[in-house]
């Protein structure tokens, strides 16, 4: 405020311009008094002097004042009495020029600017204006002191706004009241958020489902109620509180639904009424304050609803409900010195709502219960999973099946466990035309086989077979097949953990009591280490073994052979066999060998 607000007569003609300019129109605190950060207030005092003047000082004062006052109704005891209390809770003074006690100085003509700044604590009370005799205000007062003339004074108000943080739960939590009036009505009344920006509107969603045939819906009344709790001595908890409480109605909305045209199916379950009402808030603080609790002034708001129910027998029932709401001032909607919105157009209001909805980062209240990524099991999100096969599990994984030949089961530990694939591999393996291994080599390792006595012992009689009978064998690994394949292409088709693989191989009882399964994770020694050392391994475990049933040194005997796995990978052993017999004959002999196992 410039020259028109000077106190003084002709002396003002020497000061053509005198004003307080703020870098920001108002100070914004985000959060409550216990959590809000400090704010920086800055500006400058501008003075334009056309002629030299004599001055004592140039000062600027910032003062915070709180006042609580109420009038008791004349009809009550002590009617007409006025209770009030005013206090100065903040003071700050800047001295730009000071000639000293009882002294003056000449200020030459010219333009002057005096900058000022101060840090305001986040716990300072917010501005509360709009009531006639109750308020919390901040005011600047700039003065040019003169000795033989009236002082030149200019004043300017300062508004401090306390708004909600972007993470406040009031901005993200919907408020609703839902219940069932037995044999009467099921209802739900809700608002999108608890917090509402001053000067905007409140949307209320109704859902009414009659439970009584013939029940009608009458008038629906929605009210916004403002409550004031005033206390004279809030800073003195030990003193007897002198308080006064009053309420006023801010909005009163009455609505009647058209039952014939408004009836609809709700949630695909029942017939009812579903609609929304918009309650426009006043655009001035004199008719509606923001929610606050500071310096003995407490303001709260709530929505009250009354729904008339027209019973079939003619009497009228009334449904009542209440929802709390919180009204706060947005920095995006400017308020002038008369406590009115500067721009109350719908476009400005919508812009404030959009700015609130598009705050970044996202609202914490919407994600505080989210599961941490490290705790999420990816098996349900990544398809197929690491243990998933291309189709239905093969029969060999079923516990209803059993296998007598444990060595043949070991062959499928790291490869495709298809029974048909295993059968095809065994059929193509020609075991004829190779010299038999003597029993002395069996005794060298001294490890018992699947279905017979220890090496070196002979059993005559029922288990005799011709010298040309096929032998059961397995390939300990697919190294000979994948020698020329780059690393990674020979990865097992269906990877399983050691526990699952061990559990999935179920031998018959007779096989299980005679032998043990080689551990899945046992280390395989190389060929040179096995042939270079004489290893005597204790029965029944053999980390590296393959069992072959074949003809012994004499007719009518069973010989059992155990040897290192790399033995079977020798080219002379695998490729020096003849192929004179047909595939059908090999299949028959293979089946006979399986039966004897």
UniProtKB/Swiss-Prot annotation:
GO terms under biological process: regulation of protein ubiquitination; response to xenobiotic stimulus; ubiquitin-dependent endocytosis
Keywords: Ubl conjugation pathway
SUPFAM superfamilies: E set domains
Biased composition (Polar residues): 452-466
A GO term for molecular function: ubiquitin protein ligase binding
Segments for region (Disordered): 375-398, 439-492, 576-597
Listed Basic and acidic residues bias regions: 472-483
InterPro entries, per the entry: Arrestin-like_C, Arrestin-like_N, Arrestin_C-like, Arrestin_domain-protein, Ig_E-set
Pfam name, any one: Arrestin_C
UniProt subunit comment: Interacts with hulA.
Similarity section: Belongs to the arrestin family.
Function: Component of the regulatory network controlling carbon source utilization through ubiquitination and deubiquitination involving creA, creB, creC, creD and acrB. May be involved in signaling by recognizing appropriately phosphorylated substrates via its arrestin domains and then recruit a HECT-type ubiquitin ligase such as hulA, leading to ubiquitination of the substrate, providing a link between ubiquitination and phosphorylation in protein regulation and stability.
PANTHER family in alphabetical order: ARRESTIN DOMAIN CONTAINING PROTEIN, FI21816P1
Protein name, entry field: HECT-type ubiquitin ligase-interacting protein creD
Species annotation: Emericella nidulans (strain FGSC A4 / ATCC 38163 / CBS 112.46 / NRRL 194 / M139)
